[in-house]
Amino acid sequence: MRLSGNGLRCVRGGREVFSGLDVAAESGHAVAITGPNGAGKTSLLRLLAGLLAIADGSISLEGGDPELTLPEQAHYLGHRDALKPALTVSENLSFWRDFLGGGKSGESDALAAVGLDHVAHLPAAYLSAGQRRRLSIARLLAVKRPVWLLDEPTSALDVTGQAAFAAIMTGHLAGGGIILAATHTPLGIAARELRIGGAA
């Protein structure tokens, strides 16, 4: 499987964020997208996820499911945790599993993998910032998709949480997955760097 973007141009609010940008990643490989604030790291991920319109260029996924679009084969994990405070940990994960079209199995395993199985009954409002991030990460495991597009995925995670997530990412890559992550800090896994320039 190969994900590629060629000659990408992004315009937001009438301002050109970047142009002529090429990006590529193959099965079993990760790309760390780096650069100053405002350079377009998040915008690139959102283009790949189909959440922003491409001003110019092309995006393709070779070797994926031909009956599904790239967004249908990708997880986009934004820098904000999309959780409902009144719902329990388990209910939040169930919501995302249903929304993303996942099966009924795997939820308990996903919570255990991120260390939240013991608080599955608690409302998300009671979680710490790190626990909220781990719950967001559980979505990646509850619904299997080959491409992970991650925006500052280790934000709010402590050292233990970062190590656990590195192991999760390593497992995803070992299974033939692809990871592109916008980050200011090391991911804890082998990754090729794609640096985007631009003013902060």
Swiss-Prot record:
Which EC number(s) are documented for this chain?
Answer: 7.6.2.5
Domain of life the protein comes from: Bacteria
Q: Does the keyword rRNA processing apply?
A: no
InterPro entries, alphabetized: AAA+_ATPase (IPR003593), ABC_transporter-like_ATP-bd (IPR003439), ABC_transporter-like_CS (IPR017871), ABC_transptr_haem_export_CcmA (IPR005895), P-loop_NTPase (IPR027417)
Q: Which PROSITE patterns match?
A: ABC_TRANSPORTER_1, ABC_TRANSPORTER_2, CCMA
For biological process, the GO terms are: cytochrome complex assembly
Provide the ABC transporter domain boundaries.
1-200
Q: How does it sit in the membrane?
A: Peripheral membrane protein
Query: Where is the protein situated, by its record's location annotation?
Result: Cell inner membrane
Matching entries from SMART domains are given as: AAA (SM00382)
Q: Where does ATP bind?
A: 35-42
Question: What catalytic activity is recorded?
Answer: heme b(in) + ATP + H2O = heme b(out) + ADP + phosphate + H(+)
Q: Which GO terms describe its cellular component?
A: plasma membrane
Which keywords has UniProt assigned to this entry? ATP-binding, Cell inner membrane, Cell membrane, Cytochrome c-type biogenesis, Membrane, Nucleotide-binding, Translocase, Transport
Function description: Part of the ABC transporter complex CcmAB involved in the biogenesis of c-type cytochromes; once thought to export heme, this seems not to be the case, but its exact role is uncertain. Responsible for energy coupling to the transport system.
Subunit record text = The complex is composed of two ATP-binding proteins (CcmA) and two transmembrane proteins (CcmB).
Family designation? Belongs to the ABC transporter superfamily. CcmA exporter (TC 3.A.1.107) family.
User: What name appears for this protein in its UniProt entry?
Assistant: Cytochrome c biogenesis ATP-binding export protein CcmA
